Every structure is written in C-alpha cells, then in structure tokens.
Amino acid sequence: MANAAQKKLAAQNKHILTFMLAADLIVNVLFWILRFFVRSGLSKFSKFVYAFASISSGFLHYQLHRAAAPKYDARGSLLYVGQDLLQEGVTSYMVDYMYFSWILIFLAALTSVKVFAFYLLVPIFVVYKAAPLLKMLLQQLKNFKNQALNQPPQQQQQQQQQQHQQHATPSEPVLSKRQQKLRKKAAKYSRP
C-alpha cells in the first residue's frame, strides 16, 4: 500500500473530528438541560457569555473540519488527506481552546456562570506565548535601525574588531577559489 500513511492520517482526522462534533453537541445539550431544568435560568449577560463560548468553539471546529476533513471521490478513493490535527502550532492552540471552552461550559452548567471568568486566562496565555516572538521582533527591528544608521550592534563590532586584528596585514580581502576563478573569467572576457 503506497498511501498507507495518508490513509492512516485520514482515518485519524476523521475519528478526531467525529469526537469533536460529539463532544461539542454533548456539552451544549448538557448545558441547556442542566441550566434550564435543574438550575435557574440565565441572565442576559450569562446568555451572551455562553453564546460567545459556544460560537467561538463551534467556529474553530468548523475551521478545523474544513482544513482536516479527508475528501474522497465518487469511487471512494482518497483525494485529499487533510491537515494533521495532532501537529504543533496554531492547530494545537485551536484544539486546546475548544477543549478549554467545553470545560468551562460544562463547569458553568454544573456550578455558576462565574466560571466563564476563566476566559480571561486566554489573553494571558496569548501574551505568554507571544512575548518571546515580540522580543525577537523588537531585537530585529533594533538591528535594522542600527544597520540603517551604520552603527552595527555591539556583537558585530566585536566580530569586526577580531577580524581586523587577525587580518590586519593584507590590503585585499581573501577570496575563495570560486571567487578567484570568476574574477579571472570576468577579466578575460571584459578585454576587447
């Protein structure tokens, strides 16, 4: 079987997407049953927060389904495997957010809608994950600014000083063999 890995990934994605759909439906149905038949009703704010949680996790489920659902032709052969749902990165964060939303919806159904205050952890997590990227971006911008002002950063200055001390005697830069050949060839053909 030449496409065994693709078929395995397609089956895995289909299984995960089916689980996500079932979990989403079960959590939302349990919320409505527990909130309206066992506990008291909801205020407008509570309905708004529930709608936000439910719609955001549903939207992410829809996006993941579009990206990862395997597609088959009329004969049943695999056309498109889909994106791996177990990969790291944005896909992983989307799945984690869905699980986080389901847990909060379920806990809000069992206890109080004050559990939705834990949604404030999401921006904190985003800042935690984005801080190293932002720091790296600011460092690169600082390097670009220094290059534009012809003021190399301190590390580059130190490297230049070391190179200058090592190669203080030759007046011309040392060329590689390839560069020497190219210059010789250019000099040969540039003569009339």
From Swiss-Prot:
Gene Ontology CC, one term: endoplasmic reticulum membrane
Alphabetical UniProt keywords: Endoplasmic reticulum, Meiosis, Membrane, Transmembrane, Transmembrane helix
Parts of the chain that traverse the membrane: 16-36, 102-122
Domain of life: Eukaryota
One GO process term, biological-process aspect: protein insertion into ER membrane
Pfam family of the protein (one): TMEM208_SND2
Region (Disordered): 149-192
Membrane topology type: Multi-pass membrane protein
Feature: compositional bias, Basic residues: 178-192
Function description: May function in a SRP (signal recognition particle) and GET (guided entry of tail-anchored proteins) independent pathway for targeting a broad range of substrate proteins to the endoplasmic reticulum. Has a role in meiosis.
PANTHER family (UniProt xref): TRANSMEMBRANE PROTEIN 208
Protein name: SRP-independent targeting protein 2 homolog
Native species: Schizosaccharomyces pombe (strain 972 / ATCC 24843) (Fission yeast)
